[in-house]
């Protein structure tokens, strides 16, 4: 990791690794076949945090909510169920994204947290969030990064069978552990 960082990594969205296909075939999976839905976990975090990127990334369900599907549930009627869950926004001309500046910056932050400086890790974490907001065309990154009150939402299954409590109490702002646990392997 240190060598890659020293040699230079993606730091701007203009350098994101994308491929513009003639036809994005994943659009068939999401839009035509209706075989996929967004995972419940990501939407519980994003709903709880009131994340502005959500509407840039996902389609709301048939009643205007953002709801993911839990892994392994029993769906007896695909046609009934799929309208209840959110879908990815992807069009036939959407480029394939292999790697982006936000992910590179998050990974750099993890490296710094483990082998470098917690303060540098904090700065990189915040920069990664800002890059993600910028890539999605969402506003409000600075307010998002300092909101220490919002937490992941519990999961309410729109079909009523698989609801669950929130998986975490974590908030968005960076907090450095005072006991050194943030740098342990």
Model-derived features: where do they sit?
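Structured, solvent-exposed acidic/aromatic patches
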Residues: 1-140, 180-183
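C-terminal functional modules
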Residues: 133, 137-140, 145-185
């Amino acid at each position: 990791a240190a060598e890659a960082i020293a040699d230079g990594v993606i730091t701007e969205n203009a350098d994101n690794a994308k491929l513009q296909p003639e036809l994005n075939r994943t659009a068939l999976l999401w839009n035509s076949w209706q075989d996929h839905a967004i995972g419940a976990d990501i939407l519980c975090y994003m709903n709880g945090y009131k994340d502005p990127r959500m509407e840039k990334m996902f389609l709301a369900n048939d009643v205007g909510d953002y709801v993911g599907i839990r892994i392994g549930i029993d769906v007896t009627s695909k046609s009934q169920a799929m309208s209840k869950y959110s879908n990815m926004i992807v069009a036939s001309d959407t480029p394939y994204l292999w790697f982006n500046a936000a992910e590179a910056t998050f990974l750099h932050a993890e490296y710094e947290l483990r082998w470098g400086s917690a303060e540098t890790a904090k700065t990189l974490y915040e920069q990664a969030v800002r890059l993600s907001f910028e890539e999605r065309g969402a506003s409000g990154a600075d307010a998002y990064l300092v909101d220490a009150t919002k937490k992941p939402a519990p999961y309410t299954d729109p079909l009523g069978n698989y609801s669950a409590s929130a998986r975490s109490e974590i908030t968005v702002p960076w907090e450095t552990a005072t006991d050194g646990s943030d740098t342990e392997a």
